[in-house]
């Protein structure tokens, strides 16, 4: 008798992806973040759907509708804070997932990596538009500042900004279209995730050693399903601790003040997960230069496959490259810290140095160190 799991047209796709998938026997907990990102996306889509049932995308009522969700809707406060803090968990998992890819050389899977970079851009765009929806002070001014950056594009800049705004300032039209995009983009993300997985399953997973593991594979289920469940439980635990004990820890108090175009907050800053890019943006005095640096700070990830000059794939056996990697991590943490500080001495200088260092480590130091290691190993 044939097994339905292996013959049914639909179930066999799931079987080949999550059950009988041959996986390397030595992948560590760093390989858990893919499944955790899938969980985060599912949580965000579900909580977002229930929030959208009660939210109104009108400048007059948006702020009140969020208040109404928190006060009057059954467990509305829970849904709202799970969605807000779920975004933070999403980005923590994203950064760790990308960091894992950089450390172990997963970027040599060219298509998978580039789809991942596109996913990162789309997730960042979605999160930015979501932050505008509660229509608090930081929502409004964040939207104004970031959309205004497009005016730095020569010739078409100003027209482009007014086209995105749907008027001459961030207003009702902007809020409505941001809500529409914020609703639809997660489904586009889900489709891109499918493509990401499609390309990944063409090659199979990388592993910590960076070596081909075809001779040593184990079935995904039960070994990695159990492992993934542990990760899921830990993620839900972390999320619920955040939601139930300090839901506003990562938020901005200014967003509890309704949007007022006549009053600018003293320090306009985005959510914590954008601070590193925000620092790079404001480290350059020139507007267009800042915008280009901002875009390139993420786009630079797609250059990693081209910058890989080492004879080894993973950094597991390359101590000098490991040092450079952790310098890069420390630099990103510095950039994140500076992004939350006011624009004054010494923060401006630290931000500029950290921004220069970020690009220097990636474009110069990592390849040079890799070449030195090749020489040391007489390759």
UniProtKB/Swiss-Prot annotation:
Pfam families: Cytochrom_B_C, Cytochrome_B
Residues bound to heme b b566: 97, 196
Amino-acid positions noted as binding heme b b562 in the UniProt annotation, renumbered to this chain: 83, 182
Positions that bind a ubiquinone: 201
Cofactor: how bound: Binds 2 heme b groups non-covalently.
Bilayer-crossing regions: 33-53, 77-98, 113-133, 178-198, 226-246, 288-308, 320-340, 347-367
Membrane topology, from the record: Multi-pass membrane protein
GO cellular component, one term: mitochondrial inner membrane
Cofactor(s) in the UniProt record: heme b
UniProt GO BP: mitochondrial electron transport, ubiquinol to cytochrome c
GO molecular-function terms, A-Z: metal ion binding; ubiquinol-cytochrome-c reductase activity
Record key words, sorted: Electron transport, Heme, Iron, Membrane, Metal-binding, Mitochondrion, Mitochondrion inner membrane, Respiratory chain, Transmembrane, Transmembrane helix, Transport, Ubiquinone
Subcellular localization: Mitochondrion inner membrane
Top-rank taxon: Eukaryota
Note: Heme 1 (or BL or b562) is low-potential and absorbs at about 562 nm, and heme 2 (or BH or b566) is high-potential and absorbs at about 566 nm.
Protein family according to the UniProt entry: Belongs to the cytochrome b family.
Subunit structure: The cytochrome bc1 complex contains 11 subunits: 3 respiratory subunits (MT-CYB, CYC1 and UQCRFS1), 2 core proteins (UQCRC1 and UQCRC2) and 6 low-molecular weight proteins (UQCRH/QCR6, UQCRB/QCR7, UQCRQ/QCR8, UQCR10/QCR9, UQCR11/QCR10 and a cleavage product of UQCRFS1). This cytochrome bc1 complex then forms a dimer.
UniProt cross-references to PANTHER family, sorted A to Z: CYTOCHROME B (PTHR19271:SF16)
Function: Component of the ubiquinol-cytochrome c reductase complex (complex III or cytochrome b-c1 complex) that is part of the mitochondrial respiratory chain. The b-c1 complex mediates electron transfer from ubiquinol to cytochrome c. Contributes to the generation of a proton gradient across the mitochondrial membrane that is then used for ATP synthesis.
Protein name per Swiss-Prot or TrEMBL: Cytochrome b
UniProt organism field: Cynomys leucurus (White-tailed prairie dog)
Native organism taxonomy: Eukaryota, Metazoa, Chordata, Craniata, Vertebrata
Gene: MT-CYB
């Amino acid at each position: 008798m044939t097994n339905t799991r292996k013959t049914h047209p639909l179930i066999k796709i799931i079987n080949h992806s999550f059950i009988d998938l041959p996986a390397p026997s030595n992948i560590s907990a760093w390989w858990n973040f893919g499944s955790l990102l899938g969980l985060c996306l599912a949580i965000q889509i579900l909580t977002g759907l229930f929030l959208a049932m009660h939210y109104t995308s009108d400048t007059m009522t948006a702020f009140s509708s969020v208040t109404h969700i928190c006060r009057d809707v059954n467990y509305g406060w829970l849904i709202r804070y799970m969605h807000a803090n779920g975004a933070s968990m999403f980005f923590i998992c994203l950064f760790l997932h990308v960091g894992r890819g950089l450390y172990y050389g997963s970027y040599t899977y060219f298509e998978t990596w580039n789809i991942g970079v596109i996913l990162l851009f789309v997730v960042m765009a979605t999160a930015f538009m979501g932050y505008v929806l509660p229509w608090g002070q930081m929502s409004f001014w964040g939207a104004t500042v970031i959309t205004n950056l497009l005016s730095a594009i020569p010739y078409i800049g100003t027209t482009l900004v007014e086209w995105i705004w749907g008027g001459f300032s961030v207003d009702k039209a902007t809020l409505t279209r941001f809500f529409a995009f914020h609703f639809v983009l997660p489904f586009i993300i889900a489709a891109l995730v499918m493509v990401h997985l499609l390309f990944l399953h063409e090659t199979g997973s990388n592993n910590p050693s960076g070596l081909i593991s075809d001779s040593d594979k184990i079935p995904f289920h039960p070994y990695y399903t159990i492992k993934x469940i542990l990760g899921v439980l830990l993620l839900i635990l972390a999320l619920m601790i955040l939601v139930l004990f300090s839901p506003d820890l990562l938020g901005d108090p200014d967003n509890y003040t309704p949007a007022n175009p006549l009053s600018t907050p003293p320090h306009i800053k985005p959510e914590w997960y954008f601070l590193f890019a925000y620092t790079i943006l404001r480290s350059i005095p020139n507007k267009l230069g800042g915008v280009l640096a901002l875009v390139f700070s993420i786009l630079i990830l797609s250059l990693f496959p081209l910058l890989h000059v080492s004879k080894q794939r993973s950094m597991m056996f390359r101590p000098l490259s490991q040092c450079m990697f952790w310098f890069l991590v420390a630099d990103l943490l510095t950039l994140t810290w500076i992004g939350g500080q006011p624009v004054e001495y010494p923060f401006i200088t630290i931000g500029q140095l950290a921004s220069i260092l970020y690009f220097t480590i990636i474009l110069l130091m990592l390849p040079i160190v890799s070449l030195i290691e090749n020489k040391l190993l007489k390759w």
